Amino acid sequence: MMPLFNVLRSARMLPAVSKKVVSPPMMLRSVRELTNQSKNVYATKEVIIGASQKKKRSWVKWLSVSTLIIGGASYVGYLFTPDWREIVDSKHYYSNWKIRVYLSLPFNTASRVIGGLANQEIPVWLREHLLGGFARMYDCRMDDCVDPDFKNYPSFAAFFNRKLKESTRPISASPLVSPADGTVLHFGKVEDNKIEYVKGHDYDVDKFLGDVDLPQKDELDLYQVVIYLAPGDYHAFHSPARWVANQCRHVPGLLLSVRPTLLSHVPHLFCLNERVVLNGSWRHGFFSMSAVAATNVGDIVVDAEPSLRTNIVRRKTQKIMNTETEIHAPYVSGERVGEFRLGSTIVLVFQAPPTIKFAIKAGDPLRYGQSLVADGV
């Protein structure tokens, strides 16, 4: 074993390890250099990210512009490309550009959504707010109702067809009474087989009612009454006379608004909209009562035809064939016929003697059961 003395001597002969001492100024300079390097790295990243975002924004911008241009061009092409109805009949009402613009809006889809919501049950605590707000907005006369408490109406559909007190709607002894609460849009004699729904705008009887048998008698003329039901009106419709309905015709179509302010801008609107036509007879010959659907009013119920389904999804609605059902439904004045699920229009077309005298004028408010004629029927 090596003596301890030799070990210590060997250790003393080894070269000493040098320890470099860094002065404070050098440390500060190093920190600054590292900081600058970090800043450069972050700056480079920001430049890269900024360029990427700018490129993305530019791509989104050009995509949006391209979509608008292509969509606009397609829409203009749709408006000016002849429709199959125009090809068959160059004078078809669909050739009118205003109708084509209006028809391009998604009224049917919106009406199906609104119809579904109207049938949804409303929580009891919310009924006063929703139904009460609707009643105040559209001036619904709740004092006419059998039940004026909003909490007792589970849905908007139930509220729209609330029962009224019999004392508030006495049925006139007149041979022709109003079928609904509403406003008179137009009335009078049908000239040249055309129904005028607002002044200056008309449509053919056969295009609206379909093929009907109108007995030609010199002592009888054809008349019409058009009644508009506003959203705040009572939405059920009743028999306007003692008559018998022997045919229920469902005509699928669109659900365009029938507000009086729009009727004068869209020709033949009633012929475009979905409708249910009840054809029959009364003591003077032909009698017809039609319920016309509208925006948010696609649901029409006819009590005599429970299988009837309106406001449903169809492919190529305009091309769907009409459905006709033979029925036998005798009615008396004031008897309930059916209901809307909001407001819309009732059109009466009937034969009567030329001595008929109407007791109404355009713009008059009506209540169902109120007399429409003063004499001559």
UniProtKB/Swiss-Prot annotation:
Catalyzes the formation of phosphatidylethanolamine (PtdEtn) from phosphatidylserine (PtdSer). Plays a central role in phospholipid metabolism and in the interorganelle trafficking of phosphatidylserine. It is an enzyme of class 4 (lyase). Residues 1-34 form a transit peptide. Heterodimer of a large membrane-associated beta subunit and a small pyruvoyl-containing alpha subunit. PANTHER family: PHOSPHATIDYLSERINE DECARBOXYLASE, PHOSPHATIDYLSERINE DECARBOXYLASE PROENZYME, MITOCHONDRIAL. It comes from Caenorhabditis elegans. Residues 81-377 are mitochondrial intermembrane. HAMAP family: PS_decarb_PSD_B_type1_euk (MF_03208). Its cofactor is pyruvate. The gene is psd-1. Keywords: Decarboxylase, Lipid biosynthesis, Lipid metabolism, Lyase, Membrane, Mitochondrion, Mitochondrion inner membrane, Phospholipid biosynthesis, Phospholipid metabolism, Pyruvate, Transit peptide, Transmembrane, Transmembrane helix, Zymogen. This is Phosphatidylserine decarboxylase proenzyme, mitochondrial. Is synthesized initially as an inactive proenzyme. Formation of the active enzyme involves a self-maturation process in which the active site pyruvoyl group is generated from an internal serine residue via an autocatalytic post-translational modification. Two non-identical subunits are generated from the proenzyme in this reaction, and the pyruvate is formed at the N-terminus of the alpha chain, which is derived from the carboxyl end of the proenzyme. Belongs to the phosphatidylserine decarboxylase family. PSD-B subfamily. Eukaryotic type I sub-subfamily.
